[in-house]
Structures are given as C-alpha cells and as structure tokens.
C-alpha cells in the first residue's frame, strides 16, 4: 500500500514511479481528485461539529434561563446539522473505500538504484560465480534425461492434473527431499533463520496484505466455497504472521525460513517454458523472509541475496545475479535481484531465486509496525527471497552433473542426505 500522505504532498514521486514502470499515470489523478473532495468534506464536517457544539452550549444556557421556546428552535437546528453530518460521513466513507481500492492498484516506488528499462532484456548483470561446464559429449535436457532414467513421468502427471505438473520416482524424488532438507539446514544453522511451518491456504485479506490481490487474482488458485487461496509462495503467510502487530525494536531483524509447495495458475505465461519442469503449477520452494527497520532494509537485501547465493555455491552450480529494471520489477518490490542458474538445455541462465526489498509496501497494507527507541511506532520493512526454488535447482543438478552414460553425479554436499553418489537406472 502506498503512503497517501506522501502522495498528497509529493505526487511527482508517484508520477515518476509509474512512468518508469511504463504504467498509466491517470490513476494518480483519480486518487487526488477523490482526496481533495474527502478533505473538503472533512473540513465541512469539522465546521458543522463546531457549530453543533456551540448550539449545545447555547441550548444549555437558554434552558437555565427558562427560555424553552428559544432552546427548542436551537435543538431543531442542531438535529438538522446532525443529519447533514451523517450524510457527509457516509459520503466520506465511500470516498475512503474508493481511494483505498485505487491505491491497491498502485505498485511500489522503485529504488533509485534500480535501472530504468522496459523489460527483462534491460536487466543489469551484477556478478557471476562459477564457469559453465564444457561437455565432451552432447548433454541432454532434463525433460529427456529424467524419463530415460525412469524417474520423471510427465504423461501420468498430465493424466492426473493436466499440463505443467510432474511425477517423480525413486532417487529423483529423494533428491527433491534432500535439497529441501539441505537448504533448511544451511539457512537455520549457518545463516540464523528461524524455521516456520505455515498453512498452504490463506484468507483473501492475507493475499491483499501481501500485494498479491487484487492485481494477481487471475494467477491464483481459489477455493470458491471458503474463499481461501492456495499460496503462490510462503512469503504470503509468513509476512502476514505479524499483521496488525507492533513488534519490539530489539526483535528486529526477524528472519524466517519455510519450506512449502507453491501453487500458481501461470495464466500469463502461455507458450513460455512449455517443456520440462521450469514452469509448473505446483512446485516446492524454500523461502526466506525478513522484517527489519527502514534504515537497514537495503543492507538486509544484500545479505538476503548472499544467503540464497550460498546454496548454489555449496552445490557448485554456476550462476549470475541481475538487478531487475523497472519494467521487470515485481508489483510490490522496490528493488529485486534475480539469481539465475546456468542450464545447458537453454544454453543460458534461468531464474532460481528472486530476492526483493518490499520496503513498507506490505507493512502498510498489513499494519505491521515496531516501537522504536523514540517510543513511536514505525512501519517495518519486509524482504523476501527464494532460498531456493527446489524444482529448478534439481533441474540444474540433473543437467550440470549428468554423465555420458546417462547417470547423474550427486553434488558432494548432498551425498550425506542421499546415501549414494550417483543416480542411475
């Protein structure tokens, strides 16, 4: 949620933000028109209340002087003012609701360090780690390698659920589980995160609080009878854990990690990554979420990103980090780093994590604050990132660690979790 006071005071900030995101700026004008009417009504209501208070004093004085007829006239006038105030209050509430609904459609303001660009082609590479492997044989894509090993079954998955679902068997299913446990262990033991287990179904308000609704309703799975939503990411329930709460300053930063399955309709991705496991309706992810103070949030983003990178380094998978441009930036994000792992089947890097500073955007919607040393309450800043997406990491291992004989070598750090060094038929 944007800061209405800031919009009122400095609308140019929001005009510029929407221009950088290549979005229509008309919505700002609509809110400002409604806000002017709202403030005009507020002033009128305050004047009417002041007049009614004066009349009440005059009525009391007249009654004390036994001037009941004059007092009755003023009482009638006061009732008329009361009716007018009631109508104005109703109009004011309608304006507030309309402004709130419009404000929910405005994205976060990009940070000054975010490059201006139209789409993902203008994202800026920040750094690379590792060197893509040069094969002395023709490497296979995971969508061929998995079925040949008898460990991935796209056909039966389609029979069960339709397109963009996967069934895995045996050691590949175990590798998925091993990756989850490995990531949770690293983040809890080395990086100091608190593990949390959360529901996979959340109320509509929770999706609004975290910026997923109303914009992404078409992308979401919804249970119509109960109006509960399957989570698109663990970020949603974790961030909402502290909705309507005032945290203590000494508690910050709060750092949570959670493993969940994630559910996305991918309504806007028709024709993208149609083969294999890159873009699924259901996928596993380990999520990292921070709650911190405003002045610390951008340093926290750097640390959060390094925490996610550490997983790929331990797995010895080559990757790069890119700073997303304004045209590719997420709706709720002020700044995002994508971590992209090298995939031989694409001869390119593919996103395996997005690490974002949401600033106070979600905190304003969910009313998450902390009490500072000044004894005043302030909105927290929230951050989130994948630490990592399990399926895409598994794909990266399959493709980068494959052997000419069709087997897959297990990364050294995962051998204790797997109990074997290779996956074979």
Curated annotation (Swiss-Prot):
Q: What is known of its domains?
A: Consists of two distinct domains, a catalytic core and a N-terminal extension that is involved in tRNA binding.
What coarse category fits the chief subcellular location reported for this protein? Answer: cytoplasm
Q: Which GO terms describe its biological process?
A: selenocysteine biosynthetic process; seryl-tRNA aminoacylation
Known pathway? Aminoacyl-tRNA biosynthesis; selenocysteinyl-tRNA(Sec) biosynthesis; L-seryl-tRNA(Sec) from L-serine and tRNA(Sec): step 1/1
Q: Which domain of life is it from?
A: Bacteria
The protein in question is named Serine--tRNA ligase
Would you identify the family this protein belongs to, as annotated? Answer: Belongs to the class-II aminoacyl-tRNA synthetase family. Type-1 seryl-tRNA synthetase subfamily.
Keywords, comma-separated and alphabetical = Aminoacyl-tRNA synthetase, ATP-binding, Cytoplasm, Ligase, Nucleotide-binding, Protein biosynthesis
The record ties this protein, via Gene3D superfamilies, to: Bira Bifunctional Protein, Domain 2 (3.30.930.10), Serine-tRNA synthetase, tRNA binding domain (1.10.287.40)
EC number(s) in its UniProt entry?
A: 6.1.1.11
What are the GO MF terms of this UniProt record?
ATP binding; serine-tRNA ligase activity
Record's subunit section? Homodimer. The tRNA molecule binds across the dimer.
Instruction: Give the GO cellular component terms, alphabetically.
Output: cytoplasm
